[in-house]
């Protein structure tokens, strides 16, 4: 049995250094963690409890919903609506802001989440995850409006993700570095196993969906072609290409051994300037990546500086090891 620092201990000790901390944030995070444990259990049991497969419904993104998309969204709501820490929630799976029911008190935070990132991988047993972000409510104790959620990523109080793989991990930042916790099922607690996570500045791995190559802009075409040319090309070294189709899995690999992840702007669907959701995926992951020493950009601007125009805005994403992201940025500026 692991006897290290639990997540609860870690957060309480961290809050002790913040003047005026009331414990609301710690309590909210504990509710999120309880939801993540519940989701982990549902994902791990999968077909045993009949939660695999797709439904005949689509989410606001126009994507066919998996059964687990709906189940995990409900888990996040039910575990976080009641305690009086939130003024509202927003989810990738819901068209509009989720208003806290009148029977519950309102708090000073907003919760934004993707309940099951990479859900297309569920039926084939590849790692999936949950992404979340905590913002301050502009008016504490008042029901949140859509406009309250449209804050740039620099305003995040906390961002994190859970990875449901060979073990369940929770990776978290509150703006003071990045730490990873592993769920010890014997004691039912997340235990600190990856303190002070840092992304190596250099890498020989890149992740991109190569089936979209014909739609990429020239800077990305150039970068990928040079990586593929390897030691015989202008980069003078060999690269490996990865693609899991799960942002949580991709970012976790980058946090542990370096790499660059790209879902760039393309011309496949001119109505969509990017594929990933700013509020539910790009902004939280960018906060984590930057806190771990990496960079995150659309190719044209820092993702954390973007103020969302709506709840489901999409953006291009290029993030990971600092030196490789700077190479791609240089090609965009050329």
UniProtKB/Swiss-Prot annotation:
Membrane-spanning residues: none
Q: Name one GO biological process term.
A: fructose 1,6-bisphosphate metabolic process
Could you list this entry's UniProt keywords, alphabetically sorted: Carbohydrate metabolism, Cytoplasm, Hydrolase, Magnesium, Metal-binding
Q: What is its EC number?
A: 3.1.3.11
Please tell me where Mg(2+) 2 binds in this chain.
Answer: 114, 117, 281
Pull one GO CC term from this UniProt entry: cytosol
Q: Does the keyword Cytoplasm apply?
A: yes
Q: Read off the InterPro entries from this record.
A: FBPase_C_dom, FBPase_class-1, FBPase_N, FBPtase
Q: Where in the cell is it found?
A: Cytoplasm
Q: Which domain of life is it from?
A: Bacteria
Q: What is this protein called?
A: Fructose-1,6-bisphosphatase class 1
Instruction: Please give the organism.
Output: Nitrosomonas eutropha (strain DSM 101675 / C91 / Nm57)
